[in-house]
């Protein structure tokens, strides 16, 4: 082993350890890179051994298991300096499935941290949807998970509620750019609705900064340089510019069509299938206030977002095109 590699390996042993759930997801993949760049070692809870090429440069420790496996949770958090809980369920066929993952598993992880890593800073990445728990089973389960974690860990826990997150690798917001390529662009949400967003790179920078700060039991969120949010015409207009559609024409999607699609989703859910659009998701989509207030905003004065809406959407589209998800 050469001297520089030996010194690096020795230094790594003394770097702080972050235990991460949900590392294989969209946000998680970006977060693991950001943690490594900030000098953290990482220990990841994954359902299976990862593809070597995906993680070879980052050299994470891997615990194979799930958030429902108490033994795996114990191996994950033992001796960790920080625990970042990203894992969650965004679609499910049954209400109890949302609660098993988004609430019960979060509580189990918090209890494990309390027992095996009591000095660790626990950071739970929740969702802005938790602010409106009556809208859907998903929102209610995220709210229940927040409350469970805060009840168990008190001031050792920080809860972060991101708004809509987009960026390279995200399949959920890909639909926005696919719609924006059309001559007639349908508006899915209410004309008066406002939606806050954040680029995934800015989100993970905020997570790292927050977990490096002392915990104090906060419940916060993050956003780009417009925390008050965007109207749907602004979001789709920016998406159209990013995909080189110079003159999109916006048309309000007929409510009857949206409700018809949602009804099909409800029927599929009753039959035990997961559907991304159902009546509950439609209520979330058409909710009029997904803005972030100044009191909720977690942004240190020296950490301005690196991406505004136009530069962030351009970055996402460039990645989609390189990856073949959007045509050139």
Locations of the language-model features?
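N-terminal Rossmann NAD(P)H-binding glycine-rich loop of SDR-like oxidoreductase domains
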Residues: 18-38
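Conserved C-terminal active-site "lid" loop/helix of NAD(P)H-dependent oxidoreductases
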Residues: 200, 219, 261-305
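Mid/C-terminal beta-alpha module of Rossmann-like enzyme folds, strongest
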Residues: 210-276, 307-328
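Conserved beta-loop-beta element that borders a ligand/cofactor-binding pocket
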Residues: 147-168
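Conserved Rossmann-fold NAD(P)-dependent oxidoreductase catalytic core, especially the SDR/UDP-sugar
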Residues: 104-143, 158
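Amphipathic terminal alpha-helices
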Residues: 2-8, 17, 292-328
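Substrate-positioning beta->alpha
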Residues: 171-175, 189-211, 217-221, 233-234
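NAD(P)H-binding glycine-rich loop region in Rossmannoid oxidoreductase-like domains
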Residues: 60-104, 128-132
């Amino acid at each position: 082993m050469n001297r520089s590699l030996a010194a690096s390996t020795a230094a790594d042993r003394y770097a702080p350890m972050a235990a991460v759930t949900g590392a294989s997801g969209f946000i998680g993949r970006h977060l693991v890179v950001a943690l490594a760049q900030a000098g953290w070692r990482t220990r990841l809870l994954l359902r299976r051994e990862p593809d070597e090429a995906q993680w070879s440069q980052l050299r994470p420790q891997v615990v194979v298991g799930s958030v429902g496996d108490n033994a795996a949770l114990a191996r994950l958090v033992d001796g960790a300096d920080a625990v970042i809980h990203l894992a969650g369920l965004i679609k499910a066929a049954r209400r109890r499935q949302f609660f098993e993952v988004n609430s019960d598993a979060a509580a189990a992880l918090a209890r494990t941290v309390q027992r095996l890593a009591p000095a660790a800073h626990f950071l739970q990445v929740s969702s802005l949807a938790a602010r409106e728990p009556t809208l859907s089973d998903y929102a209610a389960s995220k709210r229940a998970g927040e409350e469970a974690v805060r009840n168990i860990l008190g001031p050792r826990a920080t809860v972060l509620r991101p708004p809509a997150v987009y960026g390279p690798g995200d399949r959920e917001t890909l639909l926005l750019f696919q719609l924006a390529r059309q001559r007639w662009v349908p508006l899915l949400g209410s004309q008066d609705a406002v939606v806050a967003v954040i680029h995934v790179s800015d989100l993970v920078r905020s997570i790292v900064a927050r977990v490096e700060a002392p915990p104090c039991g906060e419940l916060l969120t993050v956003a780009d340089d417009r925390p008050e949010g965007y109207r749907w015409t602004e979001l789709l207009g920016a998406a159209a510019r990013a995909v080189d559609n110079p003159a999109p024409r916006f048309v309000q999607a007929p409510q009857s069509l949206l409700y018809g699609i949602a009804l099909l989703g409800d029927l599929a859910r009753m039959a035990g299938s997961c559907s991304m659009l159902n009546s509950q998701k439609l209520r979330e989509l058409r909710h009029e206030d997904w803005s972030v207030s100044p009191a909720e905003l977690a942004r240190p004065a020296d950490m301005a977002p690196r991406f505004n809406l136009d530069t962030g959407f351009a970055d996402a589209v460039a990645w989609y095109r390189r990856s073949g998800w959007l045509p050139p």
